Amino acid sequence: MTSSDFYLRDTCRLCENNKLERVIELTPTPPGNYVLRADEVEEPRPSYPLEVYFCNDCAHVQLGHVVDPRILFQRRYTYVSSTSPVFVAHLREYASAMIKRFSLGKGRLIADIGSNDGTCLRFFQEHGFEVLGIDPATDIARTASDRGIETIPDFFGFKKAQYLRKERGPATLITSHNVLAHIDDLSDIIKGVEHWLDDDGLFIMEVGYLVDVYQKVWFDTIYHEHLDYHTLTPLLGFLGRHGLEVIEVE
């Protein structure tokens, strides 16, 4: 572990206020979702601070220390969406429900931020939509593309959105599943979403819910990938400040 591998953020990711209070301090740990080979088990692994902070201005809960995302997501990232039958069934139902709920017209562009192996986009593709994934996990993105789900192996942000809108046109729907808890610069992501969307476009995101973490004692969800633990009120304020109107919450 070197100081260049991580840093301590001193402002809230949602409201950018500096009124942060540390509320949980766990033992420093190595990053999760990194499976070791047999010959690596005895080798020392870098550990990083794991501390949860509360924003006394907007009430958002978040990690303070940010590990370089290239360490977390581009070096042997192992989580693959299609390995969970429950999640696959959820995404299949989700795609059908969103098409029906919002009367999405076939042939238009649907993009998924953090698309993983393309499981979600595959179900939209089966309904006749053009699809495009963006995911920084290079090996997984390549697997998705090999399976017919075009996937850009990169991080998403405003600059990437400018390029994609120019090259591919506006998106009618942008989705993200359990991704916005993983991103340090949330403003850059949302600016990118707002720029890439068509005038009548939709952004649908799924995020973990802090209330569940608290009530069900899901302490194991606190690790370096999960920078944010969302609740509705702070998130509504954040999205509104970026020009997005929230029309439905489940």
Place the predicted regions along the sequence by residue:
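Short, glycine-/aromatic-enriched active-site segment of Class I SAM-dependent methyltransferases
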Residues: 31-34, 203-228, 232-234
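Conserved class I S-adenosyl-L-methionine
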Residues: 106-116
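Conserved SAM-binding loop of SAM-dependent methyltransferases across substrates and taxa
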Residues: 117-128
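Conserved SAM-binding strand-loop segment of SAM-dependent methyltransferases
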Residues: 148-163
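N-terminal juxtadomain amphipathic helix
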Residues: 2-85, 250
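A short glycine-rich, Lys/Arg-flanked "PGG" loop and its adjoining helix->strand segment in the class I
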Residues: 187-202
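A conserved beta-strand element that flanks and buttresses the S-adenosyl-L-methionine
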Residues: 172-175
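Conserved SAM-binding motif I beta-strand of class I
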Residues: 130-135
